């Protein structure tokens, strides 16, 4: 049987994979099979962590808002604050509220005080 000389296609494919893994350490950037495995693993981790990042940021925003709210009012919590925001139909998302809590805490206190006053006034009047 005659020998078949491989063309440039396989070499081009391997070069493309090697460029992806050029920043990896050791055999993960040198051996083709290992590079392929590490590329799959890296892409899986990236996909998983994109979702995890959204969850972590939401958790961070909620923690910051809750800390700022509890600092001012003793018996007032994050869940009551968000519930009162929805009742008042104020469309402020958690990201914006967390930024306000860090940069301009007095503004957040003003918002929460207005909401507390209005909700308590509505509850007292019926």
Curated annotation (Swiss-Prot):
Any single Pfam family the record assigns to this protein: Ribosomal_L20
NCBIfam families tied to this protein: rplT_bact
Transmembrane segments: none
One annotated GO molecular function: rRNA binding
GO cellular component, one term: ribonucleoprotein complex
Keyword list, A-Z: Chloroplast, Plastid, Ribonucleoprotein, Ribosomal protein, RNA-binding, rRNA-binding
Subcellular compartments: Plastid, Chloroplast
PANTHER family: 39S RIBOSOMAL PROTEIN L20
Similarity-based family: Belongs to the bacterial ribosomal protein bL20 family.
Protein's recorded name: Large ribosomal subunit protein bL20c
Source lineage: Eukaryota, Viridiplantae, Streptophyta, Embryophyta, Tracheophyta
Alphabetical GO biological process terms: ribosomal large subunit assembly; translation
Function: Binds directly to 23S ribosomal RNA and is necessary for the in vitro assembly process of the 50S ribosomal subunit. It is not involved in the protein synthesizing functions of that subunit.
Organism: Helianthus annuus (Common sunflower)
Signal sequence, start to end: none
């Amino acid at each position: 049987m005659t020998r078949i000389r491989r063309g440039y296609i396989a070499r081009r494919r391997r070069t493309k994979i090697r460029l992806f893994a050029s920043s990896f350490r050791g055999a993960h950037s040198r051996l083709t099979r290992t590079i392929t495995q590490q590329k799959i693993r890296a892409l899986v981790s990236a996909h998983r962590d994109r979702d995890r990042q959204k969850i972590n940021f939401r958790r961070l925003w909620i923690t910051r808002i809750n800390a700022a709210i509890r600092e001012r009012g003793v018996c007032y919590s994050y869940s009551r604050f968000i519930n009162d925001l929805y009742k008042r139909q104020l469309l402020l998302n958690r990201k914006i509220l967390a930024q306000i809590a860090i940069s301009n805490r007095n503004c957040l206190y003003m918002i929460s005080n207005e909401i507390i006053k209005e909700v308590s006034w509505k509850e007292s009047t019926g």
